[in-house]
Amino acid sequence: MIPEACLFDMDGLLVDTESIYTKSTNIILKRYNKGPFSMEVKAKMMGRTSKEASRIFLDWSGIDLTCEEYIALQRETQAELWRHTKPLPGVMNLLSKLKSLNIPIALATSSDTHNFEKKSAHLSHLFDHFDGNIITGDDPRLPVGRGKPHPDIWFIALKMINDKRKAQGQAEILPENCLVFEDSITGVQSGRAAGMKVVWVPDVNILPFFSLSPEQAADKHITKVLSLENFDVTKV
């Protein structure tokens, strides 16, 4: 069944930011005579808001910083790295295919506005596809403490699409007719909590540290693929 709308995560799903997160984190760890960064810990951080991910990292590393201090240090370390990000394989073809099928799309990322702008500034050819349907992890419409794995961010993303449809006299799209694309377990949980179907595209480097629960593994509404390259959205 062809989805009526597709909703996307960003980091590690649309663009290759995860390698930069790993690199910048190892730079910080080295500064404090610690490291290397654990992929198991990274897997736990993925999909979380900046503050939640920072708390997980600081608890693991033992570095004596507040979440706010660590986030500021990460931003400083990453400043020159984000401009090197590029779309992951299959992404541009998929977005073009969705456009040709007139399937509306939205972006729901846990990245805050500052990081989103840094990551996307040189990738307008990718993010222009979203027609402004973008919500970040610090969006005021997202209640505090209700980031992924809670479903709220997907409901807000879908509302952006439906508000435009309503203005054009079109019927609203229901959550069960949406397809969410995610690379993290946290994101998969979030999409399913919203009542949406999910395509899980895990990073093969972190896959050994990811595992679906028995219920998730048996969930026919979760489809696992290792790449969006050659992905056929009409056959999910």
Swiss-Prot record:
One of its GO terms (molecular function) is pseudouridine 5'-phosphatase activity. Its EC number is 3.-.-.-. It holds the Pfam family HAD_2. It is found in: Cytoplasm; Nucleus. The keyword Transmembrane helix does not apply. It is an enzyme of class 3 (hydrolase). SUPFAM superfamilies: HAD-like. InterPro entries: Gpp1/Gpp2-like, HAD-like_sf, HAD-SF_hydro_IA, HAD_2, HAD_sf, PGP-like_dom2. GO terms for biological process: pyrimidine nucleoside salvage; rRNA catabolic process. GO terms for cellular component: cytosol; nucleus. Belongs to the HAD-like hydrolase superfamily. This is Putative uncharacterized hydrolase C1020.07. It comes from Schizosaccharomyces pombe (strain 972 / ATCC 24843).
